[in-house]
A protein has these predicted regions:
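Nucleotidyltransferase catalytic core that binds NTPs
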Residues: 1-164
């Protein structure tokens, strides 16, 4: 088994926000390698395709040297085993997040006893930042630049991005 401490930060990232990036940057200081896992749930509707979500994530975390991005449509516990991860990191903005993530963590641990979940509280500056807010603003024609990393925001706002 590798001595490298690998943390997975799974999410739909539809799209990845400044709040996500802040959490990823914090995790990158705690672990040898962080893997941003853009997950695909067949029962969920996404605004952005898997390829678009990966591209936005790669652009957004490009300044974090020990961070990689991948897409996965399988079970998180399978990815955890495949990567030899030491934990999954989840950001917590409020009690609702904690309750939801606790249920997920219990299920994962029940199915893989070595599965660990680490909770990091969201930075106060990003508590109100969410992918849902980005999607709502896009639907309403409102500005999203304060919610996304600059290059990601410009890409989302470009016509070429939507033709891909």
């Amino acid at each position: 088994m590798s001595t490298e401490r690998i943390a997975i930060l799974p999410g739909s990232y539809d799209p990845i926000t400044k709040g996500h990036v802040a959490l990823i940057a914090r995790a990158a200081k705690l672990f040898d390698r962080v893997v941003v896992a853009v997950m695909q749930n067949r029962e969920k509707q996404y605004l952005f395709s898997s390829e678009q979500r990966v591209r936005l994530a790669e652009i957004s975390v490009s300044e974090i040297p020990n961070c990689t991005v991948l897409a996965d449509d399988g079970m998180l516990i399978d990815l955890y085993k495949r990567l030899g991860a030491c934990c999954v990191v989840k950001g917590i903005r409020n009690d609702t997040d904690y309750r939801y993530e606790s249920v997920q963590a219990e299920w994962n641990r029940a199915h893989l006893s070595s599965f660990e979940t680490v909770y990091l509280p969201a930075d106060d500056a990003f508590v109100a930042v969410s992918s849902t807010e980005v999607r709502n603003r896009l639907n309403e024609g409102r500005d999203i630049r304060d919610l996304l990393m600059p290059e990601a925001a410009e890409l989302v706002l470009s016509e070429e991005f939507w033709k891909a």
